[in-house]
């Protein structure tokens, strides 16, 4: 199977064979071979050759290609949504919203480029001070599996708009979505070599990240892989590295008047996408006492009725599956480990079918666990921690190396202002689900959650670098010379 797209041609990979599977049925959806290091090098050379011509095109020319890509996405919206649902397990209604986000990214990126990285000028003495931006050159984009269309798109679109050429390495769990997305770019008329698709697993990724011919790497994925990349790029200030990783995100619940509103917001924060959004609430901080007990009782009651099912099930489920049987096993093992170390199950996460990656929502009270691991459990397993007072809640919320998202459910604006001020996170919400984010706002975190604000409005900042110029059309000897210089 021709699984790679290099220099405008579909080619068979020469590396390790792999497949993508429907996580519910285990049906084979895609099969092919990954790119070898030699094929990665060929793709890098193709991108390098294509870069000057693409970068020299006018901005309007590049925008026209991006707009044609948006049109192609719309033309293939149903097919793309179904492919996303099949490979990730997310319900069709959610997959359709992902395609819509991909389309909307075009206009947002164009607006962002004009506002953040366009050209600005003004007088400075007898010259003109000009600020322009230039593309880095050849950049690699590593995509995740949870939003295999939208999140890589959030790097690729602004990178191409700025004039870079791109090497796209998608998750090995979602190669079919990546292939279909690249075909939409081809349909849009993107020149050969400007975007190259390198399918493959770990070895392909290692070869691409280590290739000396890339000028930068834009990554969305796990903190473990992101940390490896950060170490690999250490001592290389000549290469731009943008990392958007996960989080051990806290959602603090104050004693609010509307318990059902709190419960609904918690569910949307913890269990949407089967808990596979990097902004999902991982830790739920609940006050000690009778009110907190009532909240948890209602949360368990409602969560136990959440519909879980296949991506195309009708009526539509709220939750689909996690991405693979391996992911399901890791989550079930994590739950067992917590329970063995003193946690109390409030709602058991279960795997109804052994050969299916469908999991039911789980809620576990970990307050009594002495050494809680600061890790992202990427799935529908919510950890509850009881707190004595608001100061203790904020301290607990910040007790993590991550810093992606944090939220507060409270009727007190004063408490929110305190929470916002003292929270260490790139996204801080008040009375809204943690998983709600606007593409027009910066998306990303601090600490172990990453550096730049990847895949959103602020992506323009790392897709081009600023060039400051002082310009005047004529070279003129100044009337007053610097002391100590004589032209006589």
Curated annotation (Swiss-Prot):
The keyword NAD applies. Keywords: Arginine metabolism, NAD, Oxidoreductase. It comes from the Bacteria. It catalyses: N-succinyl-L-glutamate 5-semialdehyde + NAD(+) + H2O = N-succinyl-L-glutamate + NADH + 2 H(+). Its EC number is 1.2.1.71. InterPro entries: Ald_DH/histidinol_DH (IPR016161), Ald_DH_C (IPR016163), Ald_DH_CS_CYS (IPR016160), Ald_DH_CS_GLU (IPR029510), Ald_DH_N (IPR016162), Aldehyde_DH_dom (IPR015590), SuccinylGlu_semiald_DH_AstD (IPR017649). GO terms for biological process: arginine catabolic process to glutamate; arginine catabolic process to succinate. The keyword Oxidoreductase applies. The active site is at 244, 278. GO terms for molecular function: succinylglutamate-semialdehyde dehydrogenase activity. Pfam families: Aldedh. NAD(+) binds at residues 221-226. Pathway: Amino-acid degradation; L-arginine degradation via AST pathway; L-glutamate and succinate from L-arginine: step 4/5. Belongs to the aldehyde dehydrogenase family. AstD subfamily. Catalyzes the NAD-dependent reduction of succinylglutamate semialdehyde into succinylglutamate. This is N-succinylglutamate 5-semialdehyde dehydrogenase. The lineage of its organism: Bacteria, Pseudomonadati, Pseudomonadota, Gammaproteobacteria, Pseudomonadales.
